[in-house]
Swiss-Prot record:
It is found in: Cytoplasm. Its main location: cytoplasm. Residues 665-700 are annotated as: Disordered. GO terms for biological process: cellular response to heat; protein folding; protein stabilization; regulation of aggregation involved in sorocarp development. The gene is hspD. This is Heat shock cognate 90 kDa protein. PANTHER family: HEAT SHOCK PROTEIN 90 FAMILY MEMBER. Belongs to the heat shock protein 90 family. InterPro entries: HATPase_C_sf, Heat_shock_protein_90_CS, HSP90_C, Hsp90_fam, Hsp90_N, Ribosomal_Su5_D2-typ_SF. It comes from Dictyostelium discoideum.
Length: 700
């Protein structure tokens, strides 16, 4: 082939790094390369078969859909041939080197940190490059119906070549030739290849044939004549020719089909072993680990379909990436593969569930467009959700298994609560939370309701950034004092879930950080509350005057025990935690933010010494009253989970209060600078000083 016909390309940087990592790092389980190449071949066959459902002529170039494996110990090569869709020249450039998949960088990072194993390479969309675990040179011949036959070649030196292929025509499909490394020649052994296919690819639905060399004994006929002359004399004994049979060993090439197993989902579940389920799961998922749980069932009646659903042990790295495929359910119609990314077959919040669905009722030539309006698919979807919930409840019967499941997929369950109104209560049953009484144990909502105090009609919860933040929150003080249990919700997605989960088992869910919290009071407590209100009326008015529009109102609190004050939000607005989450959203709707983060209510604890002394200062018209009010307001923002709009002003205020407490006199320049800093906001005046003794001492 003339050099001018060969085009050279440079690997995209991330691909080059990945190949370098694969080649220069020692991995013990190199055998994954065969699984990955067979999986890619199966995908290519799926694509051409799907095309053939609407255009039978695409198979004319090659009618058989199959995968062939040819080991050659003499040439030290391993060849895989499939009659799939094949690649055009453009496909080769795109798929084999210049464009990295979305997971390439992520995979390399996890591989280097030890968080991922080389066996997980297929999950990241870069399984082809596992060939370099065992080969130093890879040659790919490919023919697509829409292009000429091309050959791709690379020895992983940072570049690859593509040229027109003038070797044996493929008709259609792809042939990959691996030139094996000297220390990897055992992968050319027939027995090893058979074992690997059985282990990883037994349930690939296309025949996988291995070219084997078999020794056979054949008969070699020799004719021996007894007596050197043959006489026709009747008296002479007739000499019979005797055929002496001699065994001779000859070598013959034969194709052995390695995957003769009947499709697993068509068999009776009671006849399928755990090992078969595990093997099938690995073949469809690219997961190296066994599944956590499996559900094998069939639906009969007006609608018929069979399905196997699996729950993985770990969440995939890209579980919530917007560009990942909608789900991992493969759709078959009458044992014919149709597609593996049908968005309507299962809700997006269950996108971690893997498996297959084989329908008897959908038309074979159905397209993605008509599938979206298909009523049969709607019924299948409802059944799959129902069976998934059953499967999750089965996992919950084993606390250790459910702990693993919940750590990996609790966000998906909470999305189910948020999105699925029909099954909201069922998903709520699957939720687990720590509470103010549970320690490190997780409890169900059912368990919480079961141990509610007599007369308690509401489920109390608090949302926050972490368990430590919520268990030390001032909001929880009053409920702890009354021995009321509070649920800790520390996952950002909890905020969305409780927006839809208004009640559980007839009990309303109430946020203890919002208005509307009503705790049972004794007659003495009610009487005291009236007295406190009357005694602090002037204080509440003056605090509101100082803070102005920063708060909607100032009231006395019934939810505080040890803290002087707290800021609560309206019952139907955002909590402080939700406000924090929304501020972190780059594409948030600012108009919605200003509407939902409504005015806050400042609640004061009438029994706290700071508030009592503040009431005296209000009555005395003290010059430092405003300063203390602002400090209380700003510290309440922090302890209630809000962020400060002007942290520098708050810091200046604290510094000045420290100086006041230590009786340190500001020098004029510092005073001027501080004054400039603290008057940047018209709303927050600077600290006012007077000639009285330390005001901090008076507060103490």
């Amino acid at each position: 082939m003339a050099e001018s016909q060969v085009e050279r390309f440079t690997f995209q940087a991330e691909i080059n790094q990945l190949m370098s990592l694969i080649i220069n790092t020692f991995y013990s389980n190199k055998e994954v390369f065969l699984r990955e190449l067979i999986s890619n071949a199966s995908d290519a066959l799926d694509k051409i078969r799907y095309q053939s459902l609407t255009d039978a002529s695409v198979l004319e170039s090659k009618t058989e859909l199959e995968i062939k494996i040819i080991p050659d110990k003499t040439a030290k090569t391993l060849t895989l041939i499939d009659s799939g869709i094949g690649m055009t020249k453009t496909d080769m450039v795109k798929n084999l080197g210049t464009i990295a998949r979305s997971g390439t960088k992520n995979f390399m990072e996890q591989l280097q940190s030890g968080a991922a194993d080389i066996s997980m390479i297929g999950q990241f969309g870069v399984g082809f490059y596992s060939a370099y675990l065992v080969a130093d040179t890879v040659i790919v011949h490919s023919k697509n119906n829409d292009d000429e036959q091309y050959v791709w070649e690379s020895s992983a030196g940072g570049e690859f070549t593509i040229a027109l292929d003038h070797t044996e025509p493929l008709g259609r499909g792809t042939k990959i030739v691996l030139h094996m490394k000297e220390d990897q020649l055992d992968y050319l052994d027939e027995t090893k290849i058979k074992n690997l296919v059985k282990k990883h690819s037994e349930f690939i639905q296309y025949p996988i044939s291995l070219l084997t060399i078999k020794e056979k004994e054949v008969d070699e006929e020799t004719t021996a004549k007894e007596g050197e002359e043959e006489s026709t004399d009747a008296k002479i004994e007739e000499i019979e020719e005797e055929k002496e049979k001699k065994k001779v060993k000859v070598q013959e090439k034969e194709w052995d089909v390695l995957n003769k197993t009947k499709p697993l989902w068509t068999r009776n579940p009671s006849d399928v072993t755990k090992e078969e389920y595990n093997s099938f799961y690995k073949s469809i998922s690219n997961d190296w680990e066994e599944p956590l749980a499996v559900k094998h069932f069939s639906v009969e009646g007006q609608l018929e379909f069979k399905a196997i659903l699996f729950v993985p042990k770990k969440a995939p790295f890209d579980l919530f990436e917007s560009k990942k495929k909608a789900n991992n359910i493969k759709l078959y119609v009458k044992r014919v593969f149709i597609m593996d990314n049908c968005a309507d077959i299962i809700p997006e919040y269950l996108n971690f569930v893997r498996g297959i669905v084989d329908s008897e009722d959908l038309p074979l030539n159905i397209s993605r467009e008509t599938l979206q309006q298909n009523k049969i698919l709607t019924v299948i979807r409802k059944n799959l959700v129902k069976k998934c919930i059953e499967l999750f409840n089965e996992i919950a019967e084993n606390s250790e298994d459910y702990k693993k499941f919940y750590e990996a997929f609790s966000k998906n369950l909470k999305l189910g609560v948020h999105e699925d109104s029909q099954n909201r209560e069922k998903f709520a049953d699957l939720l687990r939370y720590q509470t103010s009484k549970s320690g490190d144990e997780l409890v169900t909502l059912k368990e919480y309701v079961g141990r509610m105090k007599e007369g308690q009609n509401e489920i109390y919860y608090i949302t926050g950034e972490s368990k430590k933040a919520v268990e030390n929150s001032p909001f929880i003080e009053g409920l702890k004092k009354k021995n009321l249990e509070v649920i800790y919700m520390c996952d950002p997605i909890d905020e969305y879930a409780v927006q839809q989960l208004k009640e559980y088992d007839g009990k309303k869910l109430v946020s203890i950080t919002k208005e509307g919290l009503k705790l049972d009071e004794t007659e003495d407590e009610k009487k005291k509350a009236e007295q406190d209100k009357a005694a602090n009326e002037e204080l509440l008015k003056q605090v509101k005057d100082v803070l102005g529009d920063k708060v909607e109102k100032v009231v006395l609190s019934t939810r505080l025990a040890n803290s002087p004050c707290v800021l609560v939000t309206s019952e139907y607005g955002w909590s402080a935690n939700m406000e924090r989450i929304m501020k972190a959203q780059a594409l948030r709707d600012s108009s919605m933010s200003s509407y939902m983060s409504s005015k806050k209510t400042l609640e004061l604890n009438p029994d706290h010494p700071i508030v009592r002394d503040l009431a005296k200062k209000a009555a005395e018209k003290s010059k430092t009253f405003k300063d203390f009010v602002y400090l209380l307001y700003e510290t309440a923002l922090l302890t209630s989970g809000f962020s400060l709009d002007e942290p520098s002003s708050f810091a200046s205020r604290i510094h000045r209060m420290i100086k006041l407490g230590l009786s340190i006199q500001d020098d004029s320049s510092a005073t001027t600078e501080e004054s400039t800093n603290t008057t940047t906001s018209d709303d927050i005046p600077p600290l006012e000083e007077n000639d009285e003794p330390s005001e901090m001492e008076k507060v103490d």
